Amino acid sequence: MKETKEIRMEKGKPYPLGWTENADGSVNLAAVLERSKECGVLLYPRRGGAPRRLAFREEDRIGKICCMKLIGLDAQEYEYNFYCGEEVITDPKARRICGNEKWGKKISPSLRSDSTEDAFDWKNDRRPQIPYENSIFYQLHVRGFTKHTSSGVTAKGTFAGLAEKIPYLKSLQVTAVELMPVYEFTELEAVKPLRQNAYPAKDQEGNPVEETLPRINYWGFKKGYYFAPKASYSVKDPVLEFKEMVRAFHAEGMEVILQFYFPKEINREMILEVIRYWVCEYHIDGVHLMGEQIPVGILAADPMLTDTKLIYYGFPYEEIYPVGQVPVSYTHLTLPTT
C-alpha cells in the first residue's frame, strides 16, 4: 500500500485568491469563506480514493479570506475544492474544472478544481490587430456551429472542430469570430416549480405535467468559472485545444473575440482580472461584455488592454477617450449574427 505523504501547513498569503504554486515548491491556497463555520481544503488524489481534509485555523483568517501554505504537497497528484461547513465549493479562480467533461450529463458528486499548468509553444503567434472599421465579425456558438454532420468536421462540437472551419470562414472574408461563452459553466439547471401564471407542459389530454428533467442552458449566459475554458467543448484537453485554436486563427490573420456575461454579484476587480487573464494566457483579441455593472471605463483605461477590442452596448466612449482619440466610429460598427 502506497504511503500518504506528509503535508505541512503554514500561514499563507491572502492574495492572490485560489491556488498558487510558489518558487520553492510550496502551494498557497486562499479563498473568501464564511467566518461562522469550519472551512478548509479538500485534496482529491488523482489516482482515486477519499479526499484529504485540511481545515483552516483561526490564525489563517484575514478578514473574510482564509489562506494557508502547504509544504510537501505534490501539486500534480491532486485536484482540490474548498469546503465551508457541509458545503463543497469549487474554486472560482480554478484554471481547469474537472467533472463536467460530458455535455448535458449530470455532475456527480461535484465539480473539482484543477491547478495543472502545462507549457504551450505559441511559436511565432501574433495578434492581427485589425482596425474596427476593417473588421467583419462572425458570431457563433462553438458546439452548435460544428456539432451537426453537415459541418463536415472531424472534431464536432469542439474548439478543434472550429479550427477546421477556418478555410470556410476565410472564404466569407470574415476577419474575426465572436464566440458565445466558452468559459466553464454548468449547463444543467434545476427545474423551477410551476408558477401560477406560467405555461406548464401538458399531456395529451391537456392536463398540466410537472417537469422532472433538468433544463439545459445551451448558450451559457450565466455566472461561471471564468478562468477555465469549457471542458465539453474539447476533445480531451480544453486548455491546450483552445490555445491551438487561437494560434490557428492568428496564423490565418483572423481574430478571436469572446463573449462574457457577468451578473451584478461579480465585482469589478474580478472582471478586470478575468479579461487580463484571457488576454495574457490565451492571446484573445477582444471581449464582448454583457451583464450589469460592467466597469467599461476601468477596462478601457487599463494599459494592458490598450490593443484589446472592447465591445459593450451603450459604450460611453465620450467619457473615456479624449477628443479625437476614439478608436472607431461606433455608428459604423455592425455585428452580424448567425
Labelled PLM ranges:
Residues 1-24, 51-53, 60-141, 145-157:
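The feature marks proteins involved in alpha-glucan
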Residues 25-29:
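Structural beta-strand segments of beta-rich domains
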Residues 31, 140, 179, 278:
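Conserved, mostly hydrophobic/aromatic
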Residues 33-38:
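Short proline/glycine-enriched turn/loop motifs at strand-loop junctions of beta-rich domains
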Residues 165-181:
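Catalytic domains of carbohydrate-active enzymes, especially glycoside hydrolases
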Residues 190-251, 264-281:
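Aromatic- and acidic-residue-enriched carbohydrate-binding clefts of CAZyme catalytic domains
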Residues 251-252, 261-319:
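Active-site neighborhood of glycoside hydrolase catalytic domains
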Residues 331-337:
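Conserved small/polar residues in nucleotide/adenosyl-binding loops
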